[in-house]
Amino acid sequence: MMKKIILLSFAGFMMVTLTLAQMGQKESPVIAKGAKLIRLSDQYSFTEGPAVNKNGDVYFTDQPNNKIIKWSATDNSLSVFMDEAGRSNGMYFDKQGNLITCADLNNQLWQIGMDKKVKVLVKNYNGKLLNGPNDVWIDKKGGIYMTDPFYIRDYWKRTPVTEQDGQCVYYLSPDKKKLTRAADNFKTPNGIVGTGDNKYLYVSDIADRKIYRYDIGSDGLLTNRKIMCEKNSDGMTIDHLGNYYISNEKGITVFNPKGEQIEQIPIDEKWTANVCFGGKKLDKLFITALKSVYIIDMKVHGVR
């Protein structure tokens, strides 16, 4: 069956009805029956870093314009939460309701309160600038994992030469006092997400086209690296069944915990950057893709 795209304008939104190849043959294991992919907006420059708060609202970045945008789970509205957002990329909410962001302008990790006050959590490793924190995930203890690939940015004021001896994954202790290299041996680590039980951590190596799974140790260190699939991915999320979702030029691809592909959600964009679950019941998949943001109803839900 061919993919069919129908665009319907209404109330400032755009609905994209997708007939997927597998739909019509069998019911999707993750997408709600009859669900439609809805484009909320295409007014941005490059969307990234979706993160859900305790109310189900999703915050995401319009990175080139240095803004953080809020999508309201209550009324479907979009509004600017913060200007001058440190060129934030990947983001995640902590238990206190602060937004933890990979502030790439000065290669830092920020904590942003809902009053918009900024606290710099990490600005270097062993006295040397980080490459550029890219994506972040927080465990149940409050420890923070972040990827640190090296992408040269045209807005940097620093010398465009790495000061680190690798592109790694770091772990910031729950008390925010100790930064440790949790895993290395990557070409370009990018997306990152952990399972709801905090047993496993997934990391995408976008340049090497691999998704790795690690065991999470009690000290935060990562062991038993395993290749789960050989795909490139920018962002990642996970649902309550342990299925993990990756984003790339093909849209969103879903794998079960065994690494078997179970769904493909095509996005009519050249690149899909990131994804998370949002909504009051965490049953909407929120997708950032170039100038646009999308949502689709799911039969599974996300985890915090």
Task: Please give the residue ranges for each predicted region.
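Bacterial Sec-dependent N-terminal signal peptides
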Residues: 1-25
